[in-house]
Amino acid sequence: MSIELGKFNQLEVVKEVDFGVYLDGGEEGEILLPTRYVPEDCKIGDFLNVFLYLDMDERLIATTLTPLVQVGQFACLEVVWVNQFGAFLNWGLMKDLFVPFSEQKMKMQVGRKYVIHAHLDDESYRIVASAKVERYLSKDRPEYASGDEVNILIWQKTDLGFKAIIDNKYSGLLYENEIFSTLQTGMEMKAFVKQVREDGKVDLTLQKPGFEKIDDFSKTLLNYIRENDGRIRLNDKSPAEDIYATFGVSKKTFKKGVGDLYKKHLITLHEDGITLADS
């Protein structure tokens, strides 16, 4: 049996001691799970789901805590201290996560957050982080289709908009002119694939694309008007920011939804807003 450092493992309890229990680590031998992390009803023979990392003395140790990032993942973490060797990030465990100076794009500062990738150092076998995230993003062409829902981590502001890490693997872009809310580096959210371009890069949107989104929004808009005494003080001339603040959609989607309801004679348009047709 082989274990995975920096990830969760299902390991068997093989020994009980005063300061915790030992787990079967296969070729790595017995691994300590300290008392503070041992479940109350734990007994020999039980299998526990534990995260494995190296403690302050570089010994393999287990915990039932869930870290903010695992090996092979990206996250936005805060720097808690620095020394002559690099920076240390809070990742939710007793031992902080190390970022060598060689893996920093700029000198990291205490109190600031940075998007990083966690991995195993080839030489020391330690779990370390790198702010040079580009090298850890997949170069393969994504197998996404237009409209696919994905999880994203906002990574970097550019002249075009915001770069995002998609599903912990690919790079994508949210265009500035399609963003109607405040985004910041480190934010995690759902997004939708607009297209995978010929060069393999992914264009993203925060609104569900296509007719399904419009149909969904038409229903949302109609229900909203009904729930607000049959009137809203928005129309197709309202600022995009006001529309997004109310409904979380672009002005284009809003106008199509309004048009759909108007064609069905469900609403009446006014200079100062919209009412139900029978209001």
Describe the function of each predicted region:
Residues 1-279:
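Single-stranded RNA-binding regions, centering on S1/OB-family and related RNA-binding modules
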